[in-house]
Amino acid sequence: MVNTNNKNITLRALEPSDIDFLFDIENDINLWKYSNRSTPYSRHLLLDYIKNSSKDIFESRQIKFAISDSKNVPLGFIDLYDFEPMHRRAAIGLVVDNSKRSMGIGSLSLELIELYAKNQLFLNQLYANIASENKSSVSLFKKHKFIQSGKTVSYTHLRAHETR
């Protein structure tokens, strides 16, 4: 478990009790445009995902942590995915519940995952693919000294996810 005393934010393994929160986050159509989703996940599929989340990152090439407060209430999720141990790199995915944004939770979580990646996995590169329209996420990663190394043009069709 990755832990910090600062504001009692913890990154912890997924638990079956996280299913409702995970279901709501993964099926929030307002977030799909940032995750390349276009269809909902079933509760059954997400329960299977939680059950299989104990696989080692070297086997599954990904790991998802629940971000929780001091009472173990989930606030969001942070992932390492596209894990490449030979090249010592991974991508980061981060989502904080809408009602908990702008409270520093994303920043604290990013600090913790960076420490975990460096000290436990010995990674030397973390990256994130962020839509330029996602200003708060771009700002967060810049604050943490991530460098914009490229810009894809017409890569993500965000309007495809707009509700009519």
Where are the regions a protein language model picked out?
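Conserved acetyl-CoA-binding loop-helix of GNAT-fold acetyltransferases
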Residues: 103-116, 139-143
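Conserved acetyl-CoA-binding loop of GNAT-fold acetyltransferases
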Residues: 142-152
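Active-site acidic-Proline motif in GNAT/NAT acetyltransferases
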Residues: 97-99, 103, 132-133
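Conserved beta-strand-loop-alpha-helix junction that forms the acyl-donor binding cleft
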Residues: 128-138
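Conserved GNAT acetyl-CoA-binding A-motif
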Residues: 120-129
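A short, well-structured alpha-helix characteristic of acyl/acetyltransferase catalytic modules
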Residues: 1-47
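Acetyl-CoA-dependent GNAT
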Residues: 43-93, 97-99
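Conserved small/polar residues in nucleotide/adenosyl-binding loops
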Residues: 156-163
